[in-house]
Amino acid sequence: MKLPWTQLAVILLLVGLTISYSNAWGADWKEFADATSGIFYYDAASIRSPSTGRVRVWIHNVTKHEASLIEFNCRGGSYRVLDLVEYDEAGRIKNRHDYSDNPNWLTISPKSVLEPLQTLVCR
């Protein structure tokens, strides 16, 4: 049986989106904090060091349906948000905010959500 081109295109599109979605959320997510603001995971496979003393990692707040790319200044005890992605309940992207040119570093407060993550990734 031959499928019309439109049906074939829709099937291929759905397969492609499924693979892309699996790659994004098929990462190595590990819980690092359970706070009043949400349950937080980090993607161990995404940890990168763009320069000496700096580490980047994706985090996911399951409660708020948000993922953020965080950069830590391991020597300075500070961080900045480089990318923020908001999802709906079905996992579709609602909004994306690119802060890659953000020059503002924030101090990591003791007992904050990011303190245990900094300890993990800045070894």
Task: Show which residues each predicted segment covers.
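N-terminal secretory-pathway/extracellular module detecting exported/lumenal segments
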Residues: 21-123
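Bacterial N-terminal signal peptides that target proteins for export
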Residues: 1-10
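Bacterial N-terminal signal peptides
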Residues: 9-19
